[in-house]
Swiss-Prot record:
GO terms for molecular function: glutaminase activity; pyridoxal 5'-phosphate synthase (glutamine hydrolysing) activity. This is Pyridoxal 5'-phosphate synthase subunit PdxT. Keywords: Glutamine amidotransferase, Hydrolase, Lyase, Pyridoxal phosphate. It catalyses: aldehydo-D-ribose 5-phosphate + D-glyceraldehyde 3-phosphate + L-glutamine = pyridoxal 5'-phosphate + L-glutamate + phosphate + 3 H2O + H(+); L-glutamine + H2O = L-glutamate + NH4(+). It comes from Geobacillus kaustophilus (strain HTA426). GO terms for cellular component: cytosol; glutaminase complex. Gene3D superfamilies: 3.40.50.880. Pathway: Cofactor biosynthesis; pyridoxal 5'-phosphate biosynthesis. The keyword Lyase applies. It holds the Pfam family SNO. L-glutamine binds at G46, E47, S48, R105, I133, R134. Catalyzes the hydrolysis of glutamine to glutamate and ammonia as part of the biosynthesis of pyridoxal 5'-phosphate. The resulting ammonia molecule is channeled to the active site of PdxS.
Length: 196
């Protein structure tokens, strides 16, 4: 199983380490052609407006949308969650606009207010330590969205079909259960496409 990590900004190496720890192959993606042959893609944290500029500069916007249209799973963490959202509070336009969610940027405060919180994640388990850094949260989730975790009544992890998103940085701890959950999604998608 080959999983790409969008390598424009953010905790790229940590995601690679998590993917490899789960027994899959990780590929850092910086060019559209590097999406070929991948089974799934991780959109890491960073700064969403900077990431958007880099996506545009490297001509990745359409190829990323095509990757999603082909039914390939995508996992967005922190800024990656913002890239996946159809609606962003205070912005007219989304980025990739793939998940039926509304997100608010930096909604837990700025960098100095980074914190860790123990989460219970549906389908993953309890006692998962979420590392929140300038984190967004999901203000509103559409009907087809499965809420996986909340913190202080705010949605911090959700899934819609082939898309998985979370507010926190799962790659910054050694608990790889959420990455394993994503790899299981990828496995299911591969099986489904081979049956077509």
């Amino acid at each position: 199983m080959k999983i790409g990590v969008l390598g424009l900004q953010g905790a790229v190496r940590e995601h690679v380490r998590a993917i490899e720890a789960c027994g899959a192959e990780a590929v850092i993606v910086k060019k559209p052609e590097q999406l070929e042959g991948l089974d799934g893609l991780v959109l890491p944290g960073g700064e969403s407006t900077t990431m958007r500029r880099l996506i545009d500069r490297y001509g990745l916007m359409e190829p990323l949308k095509q990757f999603a249209a082909a039914g390939k799973p995508m996992f967005g963490t922190c800024a990656g969650l913002i890239l996946l959202a159809k609606r962003i509070v205070g912005y007219d336009e989304p980025h990739l606009g793939l998940m039926d969610i509304t997100v608010e940027r930096n909604s837990f405060g700025r960098q100095r207010e980074s914190f860790e919180a123990e989460l219970s994640i549906k389908g993953v388990g309890d006692g998962f330590v979420g590392v929140f850094i300038r984190a967004p949260h999901i203000v509103e989730a559409g009907d087809g969205v499965d809420v996986l975790a909340t913190y202080n009544d705010r949605i911090v992890a959700a899934r819609q079909g082939q898309f998985l998103g979370c507010s926190f940085h799962p790659e910054l701890t050694d608990d790889h259960r959420l990455m394993q959950y994503f790899l299981n999604m990828v496995k299911e998608a591969k099986m489904a496409s081979s049956l077509k």
